[in-house]
Amino acid sequence: MTRHPTAIDDESLIAALRLASGSDPVPARVTDAARAAFGLRLPDATTARPVATPVPRGVRSAEEPRLLRFTAAELTVELEITSLDGLVDLAGQVTPCPEAGTLVEIRTLHLTESRALSPTGQFAVTGLPPGWFSVVCRRPGDSPVVTSWTRIRP
């Protein structure tokens, strides 16, 4: 036997929605976090998506260092993440090596660190807090490439 859901008329539905919207307001901390997250978006950027990185042969533990790779159509961002004393160190390389004047920004929810790339496309940041991060590559004359947000746990 098939059960059919009880039909609800439009007036009852609207009354229920009004009742629900007034009785459970969104907490201020949730609204503040949503505004902060919205402020971190880069609408003109190309998003580099994560790509699986195999654990190198001969490695006994996949815990340290952690390797991540992100790719967009024309760019790859490779990251090596290590943790020490509750803080995070991040070393990375952008390939193919962008032209001189290219900057990377390592963004967390609370701070942004900027670095110029070395001639071989490498960069490093030490002492980051654990948590969510994203890397933005800003190349002169091109739209930025941004990695998806990734969570680092020490």
What are these regions (language model features)?
Residues 98-114:
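Short amphipathic beta-strand segments in non-cytosolic proteins
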Residues 142-154:
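Edge beta-strands of extracellular beta-sandwich domains
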Residues 137-139:
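Conserved structural position at the C-terminal beta-strand
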Residues 89, 101-103, 132:
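Exposed beta-strand and adjacent loop surfaces of beta-rich binding modules
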Residues 72-76, 110, 141-142:
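Glycine-centered tight beta-turn/hairpin loop motif at sheet-sheet or coil-to-beta transitions
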Residues 35-89, 95-99, 151-154:
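Beta-strand-rich domain onsets/edges
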Residues 92, 116-135:
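Glycine-centered loop-to-beta-strand initiation motif
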Residues 1-61:
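Positively biased amphipathic helices and basic secretion/translocation or surface-docking motifs
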